[in-house]
């Protein structure tokens, strides 16, 4: 009976950890210096479905360009190019 109990013991295998690709700042890579607030289609890439600005850890942008994105989105909202709040933006 002791052998039967030992054979039923199952060891947990460690979860497979997928190596994620390193996030990079697309602005530094492509050499973009100015983020145009008059281009709402480009700015929508950095917004979620509710119209909120996506954080850096998701988009992978650097701090410098994240601030510029936030400023451009806020300017576009004031000019009514982007909505402040929405249900299904994308």
From Swiss-Prot:
A Pfam entry, by short name: Ribosomal_S18
GO biological process: translation
Gene Ontology MF terms in the entry: small ribosomal subunit rRNA binding; structural constituent of ribosome
Disulfide topology: none
Keyword Ribonucleoprotein in record: yes
Keyword rRNA-binding: yes
PROSITE patterns tied to this protein: RIBOSOMAL_S18 (PS00057)
Keyword terms: Ribonucleoprotein, Ribosomal protein, RNA-binding, rRNA-binding
Gene3D superfamilies: Ribosomal protein S18 (4.10.640.10)
GO cellular component, one term: cytosolic small ribosomal subunit
Annotated HAMAP family: Ribosomal_bS18
Subunit structure, as described in the record: Part of the 30S ribosomal subunit. Forms a tight heterodimer with protein bS6.
NCBIfam families recorded: S18 (TIGR00165)
Free-text function comment from the UniProt entry: Binds as a heterodimer with protein bS6 to the central domain of the 16S rRNA, where it helps stabilize the platform of the 30S subunit.
Family membership noted in the UniProt record: Belongs to the bacterial ribosomal protein bS18 family.
Protein name according to UniProt: Small ribosomal subunit protein bS18
Organism: Bacteroides fragilis (strain ATCC 25285 / DSM 2151 / CCUG 4856 / JCM 11019 / LMG 10263 / NCTC 9343 / Onslow / VPI 2553 / EN-2)
Protein's gene: rpsR
